[in-house]
């Protein structure tokens, strides 16, 4: 296999046994593809596909005026260029967006002409607001903060059949219902009531009999009955009644008389129940007429109206129950034939017939009026209004849309073969749904499972943005329609008709404040990726936490390979917010698909198909771990498979598909947990969630025991610098990498230079530090896709969230009681868990009523010492160490005139005005914060003079840009001259540049000429002259291009900033705060094993082994058995082996062993103990040595989920590292030197420091603010609040009889306003007495009682 630049330097020993059939797909594809589809940015007018913006425009346009004399048509749109790039947007606090310009055509028709001749056509581009762009990492920058739009899992449009599970009626009878859900428009529900009549509801309003809807659709009673029922035909001749017999219909009935065949042989005796055997005999005998007694038709329902043959008068309407009186009438009228409905109690109930009987309407108009009354109660119905309303409900494309998905689901559910069709409903659709519902009630067919992933689809960013955009356009449409009527008379242009504000507002609201537009979780690369791959059932059009029951939240069999069964939050959102599985993707309809290998006749192929939950149901799917031979044949007699959403076993020849990988079941976060298969699910859930909270440490440290997914996450998350094209590193420093692109990847006419500016010490959304460090050196060769620089929490292109710690599982002095963690001081000294946090502090100078605020170093009543870190502009220097209360930006605010005392007047007269009319409102460092200023940004409003600091910052930025562009030009120039040198070498000169004709060019000749002189050469060959001219022109063009680029950037920097109204200047100061680990910080492993640091012990006191190596962390062994996360023990053992092998390699290097010996030992590690084979043959000796050097701190291992290291392999690794195979060692107490009784499990575990730091939580109140009503101190750190002394605490003091303490707690320390001020005065006077008064809460109580209308007063004697 081919190794990438970083893989070659450090190979991870992989224990997986199964072959890689398919690489893990790009992890952010779900976001990027969806939004790319929405914008269709590169497409030309003819290439637009009917999705996204284009579809939204097409659905609203053309807009036709009310009179029909003018129309506005949509032609196409184009997107402009963004004003700022992503980094500038974040810095300036603006949205990263592009202007949208739409080309529309205004057509005015001639009123006079009969055939609507066109009078005038105007075409124009109209600005329609800004559309936010997605960054290449799948995020949006909205108002300077990075946000993620989470995908939504909602009910797919279509038709669903369900029942109430017997909960509605006390008898427990199942009431069936059908619901047609469109993509937009009114919901249509059909439901049975306990009496078995069918009702319809529109938009969940009052119910009507379903027949009302059928009547409104134009069906008569007879047509309805014909549609839903078959008929029995009876012939009457005199007193005799005979039935046209269909034998099947008799099944289950009791014979009312003997039934004979033609020969008179009795087939069924009277009183016997007719069975299937009897039916067969009747069919064989060919009995098709049956004489029946008159009573046989009593109680049956007529299928057609019964008409008097002579007079034509109607004796009985259709759908009338036959009674004895009616039969007498029929006999009198000498009717020869009656048709009745065929119903029975088993599989053909009289539901529709019964519904028609309770229906009060008799024709279409009455039905329409009834529906109108239900939809618009209180309004007087007219025929036109009722018809319009009904047509608009389900049959108008403007108001109703099933969407392609809805139509496909609808047609499939009611058994049609075609999957495309109209977006609106038809009569047939409604009737088919009713038929299917009645069939289900009759016991044919089954109800749908609403939690099946075939009935839930994913709405991604693009689709949600399109919906919002359409909402905005519909608002515009109303306004345009009104203005169109004026367009003709006033000669308006399209621009005057369209007001883009509603569109811009709808889009802005969606990206800024929708429930699914979330502040990106940017703790570490994994939390970013997980946030973008999240699927939420909440949000607009989705579920709410309170209403979601167990079923929706539960794991469903169809989640397999689509949604992770492990990763979901704990708490109220459990199961509502999920994560996509590693290989899952969405199909064109938005359903989740999972990949499978095709299996034919027991032979597994490498063809891969993606199937949705609906498509996979009929397949027989084997697991990825099913045993195969070399010919890829399944060899087990019975293979474990999934079929019809159940787990079972089948013969190999029945298998049709096979999983592509064992990790296709779980999400990215869960696939990073080694030995996941040995952990309990609840703990795995915690492990997945806690990895997302890990804070990037100062020096990232790759996990010794990983799963092989670390590289994918680091690469796809976008925090690393990945080579866009292959080439050679031209130069590299801490802040940028310059690559000279390989010739075969350079497109003609462009510079073969890629410059990568690295992000240095930038603040993330969670205030952690984003910093990139180069991995490459000058002259290194890189290929496309190689990782050239590490970001936060990445180490050599692998995700590295924590540190490998030497741990021991042992109880030790109670320091690890209840999951506490005991650490060694060495961890702190080596800065293993030191993290850098960056805080942004902002100072805003506004224009106030009394005058402008001013940012200055001249602050009243502040000593010189407090100002020594500020420059002359009043802004702190970069690099200054500041602590709580230090001034960062000096600011003064004008203050209103106050009445002055005579003394103040005198002082003013002597010392001048200045000091008194302004107050100090400087930006100071908040309490509990201490750090270093690493950056300052100054933004000034247009027209306000910029201070010296702003100019200095601007000059620095310009120098940076100029340096970049010069570098690019230098390389372009160098590469051009290199190409020329190779072309000219050995060629003959025709003259020019001071050379004689006939001179042969050599390297010396060229070195003797200045570069400018080369272009003056005239060569004997014309082709070379042409090449020289082209090269000269190319260099001139490049120079001009780069100069233009510089001017453009300069213009952007020098123009004033667009600040909020009333703001003159904003200064942002960035503080870097360094936090070491300390007691109270939360730490965790990857297996849900979390704890709080309880104590940090000196190194010499920690337990140590026989060699004197102390352990770093002591964990409580009781934390393992009850939690059932045994994965941590296996990780510890394997980690010990990994470290031991590293130390062995280190010794070999120190003893200066030969490369061949090292190669032999590495082969033993990588290729002799299970797992994937590594091809060490292709490595040179230098590369083997470089590899060995990188393995000194431990050989990293990968144990993929469900396909990891076996116990025997861990033991073999320990043996190879010359360590005990039990993984246990004898330890000695560092304090006494005594040996512990039993051997202790010691090894290396990967530990994370979570973003729950004690520094952020510790807080103490001194003097602070009080609540307005109760006058009690506020609560919480943000409000600088106090600790609540609640009722239980009061009981405790009462119980101890601590009366004075209790009194001051309830009065002066809380809400006795006078008492507390008096106490302060007393303390100042040196008088330590306390006089409690009336607590304010008593006054509040009295006011509340009075509000109930009870007069209450406190009498003070």
Swiss-Prot record:
Its EC number is 2.7.7.6. PROSITE patterns: RNA_POL_BETA. Gene3D superfamilies: 2.40.50.100, 2.40.50.150, 3.90.1100.10, DNA-directed RNA polymerase, beta subunit, external 1 domain, DNA-directed RNA polymerase, subunit 2, domain 6, RNA polymerase alpha subunit dimerisation domain, RNA polymerase Rpb2, domain 2. This is DNA-directed RNA polymerase subunit beta. Belongs to the RNA polymerase beta chain family. DNA-dependent RNA polymerase catalyzes the transcription of DNA into RNA using the four ribonucleoside triphosphates as substrates. GO terms for cellular component: DNA-directed RNA polymerase complex. The lineage of its organism: Bacteria, Pseudomonadati, Pseudomonadota, Gammaproteobacteria, Pseudomonadales. InterPro entries: DNA-dir_RNA_pol_bsu_ext_1_sf (IPR042107), DNA-dir_RNA_pol_bsu_external_1 (IPR019462), DNA-dir_RNA_pol_su2 (IPR015712), DNA-dir_RNAP_su2_dom (IPR007120), DNA-dir_RNAP_su2_hyb_sf (IPR037033), RNA_pol_bsu_bac (IPR010243), RNA_pol_bsu_CS (IPR007121), RNA_pol_bsu_protrusion (IPR007644). GO terms for biological process: DNA-templated transcription. Pfam families: RNA_pol_Rpb2_1, RNA_pol_Rpb2_2, RNA_pol_Rpb2_3, RNA_pol_Rpb2_45, RNA_pol_Rpb2_6, RNA_pol_Rpb2_7. It catalyses: RNA(n) + a ribonucleoside 5'-triphosphate = RNA(n+1) + diphosphate. GO terms for molecular function: DNA binding; DNA-directed RNA polymerase activity; ribonucleoside binding. Keywords: DNA-directed RNA polymerase, Nucleotidyltransferase, Transcription, Transferase. The RNAP catalytic core consists of 2 alpha, 1 beta, 1 beta' and 1 omega subunit. When a sigma factor is associated with the core the holoenzyme is formed, which can initiate transcription. Disulfide bonds: none annotated.
